[in-house]
Structures are given as structure tokens and as C-alpha cells.
């Protein structure tokens, strides 16, 4: 049988993971406060201030050895450069989507991630899929097709978020680095370009810093904390709970985002969108039930 974590440790881990996903679910409220700032500039700030925050944590933990090792090999740099590009693309589309009135579609992207991860496991890692998993992926594909036919457009925001985050997750799975060191490497590789862009924005008088209210500037400077804190919670929780538990908790974020989109931001959610979501949710239910049954069979 798979060993169970100590009850107290598992409880703390579950709480940390739940807080992480709740944080990610509520974060559209934060980004909406920054809607007046250019999305590309926001991502540049996010890269720079995430690096500052993460480096401070690494310095506190004396974790320089792993960071130097990751930056010292050509393969390590290449792998992390690709993951950096995927992560930055994901951030950019997400922030733009939230601030352009597409919170519901952003939530759809993250509902698709577990099913896309399963598909990537089959196509990239050659993992065998159970029949229920294939049906679940098929349900998601039907949901996307319904969106295309009934709504009249492909949900490109959702698909881009799912593909970039799914691809990023795959690369992180192949990487030996922990979440914190991985984020440090990824931001280190792109922060110089981001910093140069921010300096250019400031020089032209278009940058947010020095040209906006004190509250807005404080929110911009806090992008690093907003990025790194949930990752620290995730890293703490993931080490202390089962992967299946973590998989169930991941639905918190898109569920909260969806709820915000419908209630707080009052975005349109018509019957055609409801039908598309219904197919995807059905796939997720099937996927989750199948995983739980498989876990019981393995640990019996």
C-alpha cells in the first residue's frame, strides 16, 4: 500500500494547497484593479518583482547551490527557457483575458488543464490511458466543438491557457528543480528583457511607476508577492498530501474564477456556453471518479 502522510502533516498540507488554489481563484479581483496598466507591462513587472521576491526567499533558505547548478548546464537553461516562454505566455493571456472581460473563458481554460495533462501524458510520455480517461477527453473535445459551433468562435483564450499551462506542467515534471528554484531560474532568464522593457516604458513616460496613484504603484510592485506566495503554499502542500487529493483541490481555482465571472463581473453566460461547460464538467467528473477508483484498486 502507498504510505499515508501523518494526519497532522496531511491536514496542514491540504490547508496550504486549498489556500493556494483559493488564492489563484480570487486573483482576478487583484488584476482588475490594474486594468488601466498595459498587460505587457504588467507581465514585465511580474517577472522582475517575482525574481526579487524569490531571490530573497532563496537567500533566506540558502538555496543558491541548486540555482547555480540549474543555470550551469546548457540543457537546464534550454529546458527552463522553454518553460519560461510558456509561463510568460500563460500569464500574458490570462491577465489580458481577465482585464478584457473574459473571466469565465479563463476559468474554462483551467477546467481543461487536467484533461489536457492526461492527453499529453499519452501523446508525449506514452502513458497508457484507461477507457474512462479517453471518454473524459472526448467529452472535453465535444465541449470545445459546441463552443465553436454554437457560439461561433473558438475559445482561444481558454485553449491558449490550457495548452501553455499544460505544456509548462509537463516541462516542470521533466525538470528536477523544485517549484521555488524553478521559478527563480525561469524569471532569471527573462527578467533582463523585462527590465529593459520597463526602463523604456518609464523613459517614454508610459510606465505606471511614477505616473500613477500611490495605490496603483503599490499594487504593481506587489505582483512578485502575488505570484510567489501561492507557489510557496503549493510547494508546501504538494509534499504533504497525496497527488489524488491535490488533483481534487485543483478545481477550487477555476470554480471560484467562474463564480466571480458570473456574479461579480456579471459576464454573459448563455445556454450555448452552459452546454459547452456541461460537456467539459461531465468529462471532469468522469476523470475524477476514474482516478479515485484506480487509487482504491492500487492501494487495496
Question: Where are each of the predicted segments found?
Answer:
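C-terminal-most transmembrane helix of multi-pass membrane proteins
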Residues: 2-4, 251-300
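Structural motif at transmembrane-helix junctions in multi-pass transporters
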Residues: 36-41, 92-109, 232-249, 268
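Hydrophobic transmembrane alpha-helices of multi-pass small-molecule transport proteins
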Residues: 54, 129-148, 159-163, 272-291
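Transmembrane alpha-helices of multi-pass small-molecule transport proteins
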Residues: 38-89, 116, 164, 185-201
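Helix-helix packing/entry segments at the starts of transmembrane helices
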Residues: 108-112, 177-189, 228-263
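Glycine-/small-residue-enriched transmembrane alpha-helix faces in small-molecule transporters
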Residues: 1-41, 138, 142-174, 196, ...
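Loop-to-transmembrane-helix transition segments
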Residues: 12-20, 64-93, 156-160, 208-229, ...
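C-terminal transmembrane-helix exit sites in multi-pass transporters
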Residues: 96, 112-132, 255-274
Amino acid at each position: 500500500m502507498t504510505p499515508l502522510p501523518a494526519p497532522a502533516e496531511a491536514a496542514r498540507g491540504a490547508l496550504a494547497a486549498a489556500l493556494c488554489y483559493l488564492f489563484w481563484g480570487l486573483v482576478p479581483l487583484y488584476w482588475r484593479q490594474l486594468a488601466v496598466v498595459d498587460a505587457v507591462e504588467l507581465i514585465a513587472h511580474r517577472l522582475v518583482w517575482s525574481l526579487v521576491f524569490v531571490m530573497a526567499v532563496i537567500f533566506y533558505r540558502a538555496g543558491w547551490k541548486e540555482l547555480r547548478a540549474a543555470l550551469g548546464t546548457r540543457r537546464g537553461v534550454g529546458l527552463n527557457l522553454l518553460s519560461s516562454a510558456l509561463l510568460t505566455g500563460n500569464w500574458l493571456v490570462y491577465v489580458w483575458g481577465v482585464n478584457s472581460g473574459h473571466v469565465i473563458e479563463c476559468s474554462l481554460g483551467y477546467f481543461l488543464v487536467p484533461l489536457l495533462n492526461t492527453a499529453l501524458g499519452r501523446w508525449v510520455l506514452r502513458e497508457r490511458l484507461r477507457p474512462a480517461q479517453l471518454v473524459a477527453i472526448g467529452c472535453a473535445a465535444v465541449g470545445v466543438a459546441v463552443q465553436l459551433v454554437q457560439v461561433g468562435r473558438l475559445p482561444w483564450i481558454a485553449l491558449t491557457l490550457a495548452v501553455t499551462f499544460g505544456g509548462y506542467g509537463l516541462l516542470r515534471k521533466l525538470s528536477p528543480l523544485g517549484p521555488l528554484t524553478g521559478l527563480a531560474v525561469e524569471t532569471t532568464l527573462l527578467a533582463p528583457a523585462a527590465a529593459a522593457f520597463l526602463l523604456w516604458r518609464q523613459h517614454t513616460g508610459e510606465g505606471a511607476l511614477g505616473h500613477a496613484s500611490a495605490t496603483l504603484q503599490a499594487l504593481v510592485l506587489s505582483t512578485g508577492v502575488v505570484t510567489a506566495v501561492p507557489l510557496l503554499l503549493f510547494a508546501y502542500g504538494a509534499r504533504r498530501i497525496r497527488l489524488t487529493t491535490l488533483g481534487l483541490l485543483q478545481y477550487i481555482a477555476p470554480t471560484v474564477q467562474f463564480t466571480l465571472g458570473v456574479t461579480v463581473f456579471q459576464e454573459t453566460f448563455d445556454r450555448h456556453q452552459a452546454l459547452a461547460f456541461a460537456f467539459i464538467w461531465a468529462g471532469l467528473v468522469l476523470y475524477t471518479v476514474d482516478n479515485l477508483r484506480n487509487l482504491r484498486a492500487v492501494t487495496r
